[in-house]
Amino acid sequence: MSKNFINLYTFAGVICSTYRLPLPRLLEPLSMVLVLTIGWIIFLSSFIPVHFLLKGHDKLRKNLERCLVELICSFFVASWTGVVKYHGPRPSMRPKQVFVANHTSMIDFIILEQMTAFAVIMQKHPGWVGLLQSTILESVGCIWFNRSEAKDREIVTKKLRDHVLGVDNNPLLIFPEGTCVNNHYTVMFKKGAFELGCSVCPVAIKYNKIFVDAFWNSKKQSFTMHLLQLMTSWAVVCDVWYLEPQNIRPGESPIEFAERVRDIISTRAGLKKVPWDGYLKYSRPSPKHRERKQQSFAESMLRRLEEK
């Protein structure tokens, strides 16, 4: 089953074409900011009363907050002129399942969130993104961690296990690569999502670079500038596949399970698997590690020369 979501600007484009209005003027960055501003006004004027006035009605409050988070994410996608095609059944809320996806940009979360209010595990960010994490996204059960804090790993692991067992919790979403990759490759998946003792639901995301490259290089560009780049492009075109749930096989280790799921996602999205650790983006290898690798490479080259 596939479902097309045509956002506000796609609809506006049809109107402009019908009535011969100047489409390029409509797509100016100011218009994109206006759409997002309207979205925030609608969201905040609804979210604040719901969050503070319905504290005694937890189930109703959670359902309304979930819908409002999906709404603001839809406005974000509309501000990029996003054209997203979803393939497969909509994710359901049930215990003992976790969704895993390849990771290109923080907008992956927004694109998936407009379809279903996932609780995501995410690195803590500074600035306005961090403010959203500690306020609005807390309402859907998102879990934060800090790569530099070793003790965070144990705390996060416990939170993950508790979350997947909850009946009324939002579906849990994890990006097991641990970093943004350029949507040509998939790097090694961390095993944490694959040792929770639950079903793993793969999600494959593939961007079409016809109008803009959705890859976010956090080392070179702030997320604010990344959003502005998307908002000043013609469109963000993307396909999302919700794939068949997978379970660990008898005798299969969590690492082997992770590799099998990575293979499923890579095949569906047309991405190349590479044996790289995404965390190397955030830390330099030690001199001893480099020396061992150099020594190993030199020995392999000498063996090849001797064979010739």
Can you describe what each PLM-predicted range is?
Residues 1-80, 292-303, 307:
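N-terminal membrane-anchoring alpha-helices
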Residues 21, 39, 43, 78, ...:
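Short amphipathic alpha-helical interaction elements and helix-loop-helix interfaces
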Residues 24-31, 39, 43-44, 70, ...:
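Amphipathic alpha-helical interface elements that mediate macromolecular binding in regulatory proteins
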Residues 33, 76, 84-86, 97-112, ...:
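Structural signal for hydrophobic/aromatic residues that build the beta-strand cores
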Residues 42-71, 75-80, 90-150, 210, ...:
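Catalytic core of membrane glycerolipid acyltransferases/transacylases, capturing the structured
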Residues 56-68, 91, 101-104, 112, ...:
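Short amphipathic alpha-helical molecular recognition features
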Residues 83-87, 92-96, 104-108, 128-132, ...:
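Eukaryotic intrinsically disordered and solvent-exposed regulatory patches
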Residues 130-140, 170-171, 178, 182-260, ...:
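A cross-family acyltransferase "interaction/gating" segment
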